[in-house]
């Protein structure tokens, strides 16, 4: 919608540009205020936030992957003026056509994650960590575990 311009942040330069082009083509009433790839350092956050603010965007789609996108949003939301920020994971890869979505049957039964894991086997490491994470959340909640863990290294 023209009243809610969007900004895309994340992916490779080629992927985010192609995602922007496809969104503009498929949704002619959507105003793309701008886009920027996701390969930048923390030192560039202020410059990126300024670019987003100056674009006039009201919605920011952040596709930096989990948990980087959530951490980036949390760290920078105060710099973004009146902007709604949403983490979208690898959506730009799908929108750009770089990655195919799971067949509809897989989507309907909730197995799109498995299809993506087969396309990108490196995701398997994350899946293995989830039960451990849940167990540690429970143990921590009841004071049975107190050590800090860096999950994503």
Per-region residue spans from a language model:
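Conserved beta-alpha
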Residues: 1-51, 55
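Short glycine-rich anion-binding loops that position phosphate/pyrophosphate groups of nucleotides
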Residues: 64-69, 91-92
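A transmembrane-helix-recognition feature enriched in membrane-embedded lipid enzymes
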Residues: 101-153
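Short, flexible loop segments at boundaries between secondary-structure elements
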Residues: 37-43, 81-119
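Structural motif
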Residues: 7, 59-63, 86
């Amino acid at each position: 919608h023209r009243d809610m311009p969007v900004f895309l942040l994340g992916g490779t330069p080629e992927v985010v540009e192609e995602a922007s082009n496809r969104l503009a083509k498929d949704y002619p009433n959507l105003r793309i205020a701008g886009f920027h790839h996701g390969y930048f350092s923390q030192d560039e956050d202020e410059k990126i936030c300024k670019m987003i603010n100056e674009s006039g965007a009201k919605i920011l789609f952040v596709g930096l992957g989990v948990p980087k996108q959530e951490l980036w949003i949390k760290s920078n939301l105060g710099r973004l003026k009146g902007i709604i920020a949403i983490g979208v994971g690898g959506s730009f890869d799908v929108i750009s056509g770089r990655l195919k979505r799971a067949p509809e049957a897989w989507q309907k039964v909730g197995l799109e994650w498995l299809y993506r894991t087969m396309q990108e086997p490196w995701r398997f490491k994350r899946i293995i960590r989830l039960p451990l994470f849940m167990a540690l959340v429970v143990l921590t909640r009841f004071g049975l575990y107190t050590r800090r863990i860096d999950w994503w290294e």
